[in-house]
């Protein structure tokens, strides 16, 4: 073996734990904050929200602009619905914006996008905001 090659040391079975099992702390119950967090973990507050679709620029207006959607749905549900209602072809694009501020990802949950009374989604046939 050359001087440049170093060997990786073998595992040493003589390693001692810093504490013995008798000296370690065993929790008999969880702290209050952890217990409360675990009670609500996994249970999503699924409710219906109002979604208002608003055309931007020269985008065609829908006859029905307001509909209800469960908060556990993804944003792509809105985009697919909109594409179907507008009759958009596969090679054409629809650009959607929440509150005329940002374009969420298609996999984003709708429940995290709204606040207040309704979710306002602006849509355009060409990029509307830089």
Swiss-Prot record:
One of its GO terms (biological process) is glycophagy. Transmembrane segments: none annotated. It comes from the Eukaryota. It is found in: Preautophagosomal structure membrane. There is a cross-link at residue 130 (Glycyl lysine isopeptide (Gly-Lys) (interchain with K-159 in ATG5)). Keywords: Autophagy, Isopeptide bond, Membrane, Protein transport, Transport, Ubl conjugation pathway. One of its GO terms (molecular function) is protein tag activity. It is a peripheral membrane protein. One of its GO terms (cellular component) is phagophore assembly site membrane. Its main location: membrane. Forms a conjugate with ATG5. Belongs to the ATG12 family. Ubiquitin-like protein involved in cytoplasm to vacuole transport (Cvt), autophagy vesicles formation, mitophagy, and nucleophagy. Conjugation with ATG5 through a ubiquitin-like conjugating system involving also ATG7 as an E1-like activating enzyme and ATG10 as an E2-like conjugating enzyme, is essential for its function. The ATG12-ATG5 conjugate functions as an E3-like enzyme which is required for lipidation of ATG8 and ATG8 association to the vesicle membranes. This is Ubiquitin-like protein ATG12. It comes from Phaeosphaeria nodorum (strain SN15 / ATCC MYA-4574 / FGSC 10173).
């Amino acid at each position: 073996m050359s001087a440049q090659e170093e060997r990786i040391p073998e595992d040493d079975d003589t390693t001692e734990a810093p504490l013995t099992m008798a000296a370690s702390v065993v929790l008999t119950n969880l702290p209050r904050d952890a217990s409360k967090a675990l009670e609500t973990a996994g249970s999503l507050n699924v409710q219906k929200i109002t979604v208002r679709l608003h055309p931007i620029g020269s985008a065609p207006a829908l006859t029905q602009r307001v509909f209800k959607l469960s908060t556990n749905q993804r944003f792509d549900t809105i985009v697919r619905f909109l594409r179907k209602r507008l009759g958009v072809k596969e090679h054409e694009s629809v650009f959607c914006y929440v509150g005329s501020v940002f374009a969420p990802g298609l996999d984003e949950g709708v429940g995290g996008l709204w606040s207040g009374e309704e979710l306002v989604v602006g849509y355009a046939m060409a990029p509307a905001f830089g």
